[in-house]
Amino acid sequence: MQPCQGWLRQKPCPVRRDILAGSLGEAWIAEHRFAFPLLLRSPGYHTGRNFILIANGAGLTEAAANLPGDELLVIEYLDARGSDGSARKYRVMMIGGEIYPLHLAISGNWKVHYFSSDMADRPDHRLEEMAFLGDMRSRLGDKAMAGLAAIRDALGLDYAGVDFGLAPSGDLLLFEANATMVIAAPDSDPRWAYRRTAITSVIDAVVALIRQRAAGLGCQAIDHAAI
């Protein structure tokens, strides 16, 4: 997908690992118009494995040498930190053309995952997530909402998830968009009670979509409990 009004994405470029691990690594970075800090990733890994931030050229050779695989991805670093210095990762689900908020993870680490964030220990962060889940448009703003609509239309999928941050300009910073995004329900801890309505809304939308498609195919209705 090409960026358009309302959203931006990180510029990625594949490169042989031995180039970055050798004496010409910094020259390759400059030639391809990347600047430090930048991200370096081994393709095929998930949940942040083998995905690192390189602050300057001094750390490039060693970092590239220690990552697995013959090919790496050099990725532009787009700063998703807010005025408080914390990074934010929003997740929405796109079900049958509608956009649903799923969660907001806030962390002091640039590499934000809900399971490794400090949401459990920060009531103020949970309040911020609650505000996002309760009124997505007010939290994100019109530019980011327009960006989400553009991404939805470009994907053209019945089911998709999008992870993103917000730029100071109000534009959406796209991290990831795919058709296999997981809807992970929180545990029974009462601290997460505010998240359950949003998750239920997404699951209900998925069930309704499946039933609609099944009815169109002349299939029997699908039991909600089996989903």
Give short role names for the model-derived ranges:
Residues Y45, G97, A167-G170:
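Short strand-connecting beta-turns/loops that link adjacent beta-strands
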Residues K11, D70-I75, D158, A205-L209:
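Short, structured loop/turn "capping" segments at alpha-beta junctions
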Residues V162-F164:
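Hydrophobic residue at the +6 position relative to the catalytic HRD Asp in the kinase catalytic loop
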Residues K143-D158:
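Short, internal acidic amphipathic alpha-helical interface segments
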